[in-house]
Amino acid sequence: RSLFDGGPAAIVRSRPTLGDVAFLTCRGGWPKAVGQPKELALQQAQDYVDAVVESDISRVDGVRRDPGRVCMLMRSYARMTASQGSYETMLRDVAKLGLSFGRTSFLEYVAALKRLFVTDDLGAWNPNLHAKEDVRTSPTWHFVDPSIATAALGAGPGDLMGDLNTFGLVFESLCVSSQSECDVKICVAFASEASYDSSRMRGG
């Protein structure tokens, strides 16, 4: 609370390379991954995604769901991480990946991922009902941990280094979904009784 009251901020110095950040983004914040050799650390997120696809998605409410559809849905979600759009956009993307969903079935799968706390979409922020700027009102799509996105895409640190656009989006998800869920959202909520939302103009 002292920080919000104007108190001094602690200074932490760190000099990670871009490669270090790529690794940490793909490793994620899984406690079991911390301190492990890199290969084992990266495997934690993949094991989690496999568990969601093969069993957890059906076990959450007792409804049997097709692992292939779950896999493609999570891959599409990963392709659109840190972006805004309609469910229709994601439905079209899933179709391009080789599967077709009915809208009702699709929404049930999305809801199951939310119940499992796999996804953590960030609500849109509208500063003023009469704002001159055309503010987007769609939520921003995120997984609860950015490593879920990279695992769903089958991407590793080297892949992110070779595609900085995707790296930037997943890094945004790291900042918003992973860190803020544990730290920023809680601090803001308790210290200033505020909410945590996203703001983006329709032009970009």
Language model features with spans:
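A generic structural signal for secondary-structure junctions
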Residues: 1-2, 153
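Amphipathic alpha-helical "lid/sensor" segments that cap RecA-like P-loop NTPase cores
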Residues: 3-51
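Accessory nucleic acid-recognition modules appended to NTPase machines
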Residues: 34-201
